[in-house]
Curated annotation (Swiss-Prot):
Keyword check for Hydrolase: yes
Protein's organism: Frankia alni (strain DSM 45986 / CECT 9034 / ACN14a)
Record: residues binding DNA: 312, 317
Listed Pfam families: AAA_lid_4, RuvB_C, RuvB_N
Lineage of source species: Bacteria, Bacillati, Actinomycetota, Actinomycetes, Frankiales
A GO term, aspect molecular function: ATP hydrolysis activity
Region (Large ATPase domain (RuvB-L)): 3-183
Protein family membership: Belongs to the RuvB family.
UniProt protein name: Holliday junction branch migration complex subunit RuvB
Length: 366
């Protein structure tokens, strides 16, 4: 399944419109991220007591965990307007000047994908965040003149899925930073129960648990699966989403008990069935499943790594014992006759998400 598939954390424009009706409006309604909610609540209450805008907020974490919802909640809790834009939409410094000078006092500016903002615009943002001022340059060369323009006090909420790409000067200007983590199954079940109530879906407790367990720790995926399961319940069942109904529905959509889709399983089956569990190079593995290496690396591998089904080593990709177990197979011995378990424990592993100079490491591999 492609990056925009059923268990992808990315959201289409149509889905974003649908999500608007499910978003929580207050920190109390927001499920999960307990520490982040508590920290935000204290900061917002303190700012309101002082009668000043709160510090600028940076929210990081994988897509689909609620960064946009929290930005909306911040504005709602402060009872101020919210203006939304994104890093890719700001191509020139002038684009940002137009936005900043139009802000009303206390307004919240939400800048999604802030790591993708153009460098000239980012540099202009520094003074706006610190001094509520922007310097507009008129002319070029030695005769250029800087005209300072005041900006109404505001709160910037930046969101990023790749905080490592933020420059130090930009990151340092945020007074509050928080990282959103993946959700536990019980938290996702609460998200699903709330969404089912808003959508008018009859969802049993075990049905919610079943969908939650296949949602990859991501509320956006959970809500997407709920919509598909609802369709199945209405068309082929009695309209009630039970555990059995959820299982039958998600079987049709090729989402298994761990939340793996067609591509995920194809990668695992190739790694285990064709290459004996590895190690095997990325290019060889991608060719074996008929996908581009970038697709395997960016779409399938992140969740397989997080689920403990695949690891990256200096010799290539290797299937873990859990991968064999998930496929209903026994771990095989490596060419030296050892079991897979010592191989995993003795291999020097890079941190999850690291890139390795491996390829052509399996016999016959590319």
């Amino acid at each position: 399944m492609s990056a925009d598939g059923l268990v992808s954390a990315a959201a289409s424009a149509e889905e974003q419109a649908f999500e608007a009706g499910l978003r929580p409006r207050t920190l109390t309604e927001f499920v999960g991220q307990r520490k982040v909610r508590e920290q935000l609540s204290i900061m917002l209450e303190g700012a309101q007591a002082r009668g000043r805008p709160p510090d600028h907020v940076l929210l990081s974490g994988p897509p689909g965990l609620g960064k946009t919802s929290l930005a909306m909640i911040i504005a709602e809790e402060l009872a101020v307007p919210l203006r939304m834009t994104s890093g890719p939409a700001i191509e020139r410094a002038g684009d940002l000047v137009a936005i900043l000078t139009a802000l009303s006092p206390g307004e919240v500016l939400f800048l999604d994908e802030i790591h993708r903002i153009a460098r000239p615009a980012e540099e202009l943002l520094y003074a706006a965040m610190e001094d509520f001022r922007v310097d507009v340059i008129l002319g070029k060369g030695p005769g250029a003149t800087a005209i300072p323009l005041d900006v109404a006090p505001f709160t910037l909420v930046g969101a990023t899925t790749r905080s490592g790409l933020l420059t130090g000067p930009l990151r340092d200007r945020f007074g509050f930073t928080a990282h959103l983590d993946f959700y536990a199954p019980d938290e996702l079940a609460r998200v699903l129960t709330r969404s089912a109530g808003l959508l008018g879906v009859s969802l049993t407790e075990d049905g919610a648990a079943e969908v939650a367990g296949r949602s990859r720790g991501t509320p956006r995926i959970a809500n997407r699966l709920l919509r598909r399961v609802r369709d199945y319940a209405e068309v082929r069942a009695d309209g009630v989403v039970t555990r059995d109904v959820a299982r039958a529905a998600l079987r049709i959509y090729d989402v298994d008990g761990l939340g793996l889709d067609r591509l995920d399983r194809a990668v695992l089956e190739a790694l285990v069935g064709r290459f004996g569990g590895g190690p095997v190079g990325l290019t060889t593995l991608a060719v074996s499943v008929g996908e581009e290496p970038e697709t395997v690396e960016d779409v399938a591998e992140p969740f397989l790594l997080r689920a403990g089904l695949l690891i990256r080593t200096s010799r290539g990709r290797i299937a873990t014992p859990a991968a064999f177990e998930h496929l209903g197979l026994e771990p095989v011995a490596d060419p030296l006759g050892r079991s897979q378990a010592p191989l995993f424990s003795n291999t020097g592993l890079l941190a999850e998400g690291g890139l390795l100079p491996e390829d052509g490491l399996h016999p016959g591999g590319g």
